């Protein structure tokens, strides 16, 4: 946009549309594998069925952790644990959303032992990727 000397700008007649990021682009920005939150229709803990929709994906990704930093941190934590003689460390996850910490832990060779979340969609995403054991 270029401002004119007497006010206004040279692009008064041009309308601008800002494109919303897709859930796939949001997954990539947060460091998740493509399609991580694309779980289709799902059933919550009370047995209620939910249709496939982008809204819970956006919310879950917005409330999630950015994996690159936590990957860096987990690699260093794992090294410290192994340097202290703990060969097979296990770690837990508390309120991380869509399984971000278990994903990071497993990438570092650490066994995630449990995950806790209070919202239904993130619970469903975590169960899809890690099963019922978390």
Spans of model-derived segments:
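C-terminal target-recognition/interaction regions appended to catalytic cores
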Residues: 1-96
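Core alpha/beta nucleotide-donor-binding catalytic domains of modification enzymes
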Residues: 81-134
């Amino acid at each position: 946009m270029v401002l004119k000397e007497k006010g206004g700008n040279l692009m008064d007649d041009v309308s601008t549309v800002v494109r919303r990021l897709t859930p796939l682009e949001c997954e990539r920005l947060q460091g998740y594998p493509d399609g991580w939150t694309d779980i289709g229709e799902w059933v919550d803990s009370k047995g209620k069925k939910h249709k496939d929709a982008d809204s819970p994906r956006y919310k879950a990704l917005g409330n999630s952790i950015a994996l690159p930093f936590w990957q860096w941190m987990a690699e260093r934590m794992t090294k410290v644990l192994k340097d202290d003689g703990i060969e097979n460390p296990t770690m837990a996850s508390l309120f991380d959303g869509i399984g971000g910490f278990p994903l990071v832990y497993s990438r570092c060779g650490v066994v995630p032992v449990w995950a806790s979340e209070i919202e239904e969609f993130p619970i469903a995403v975590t169960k899809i990727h890690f099963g019922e054991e978390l």
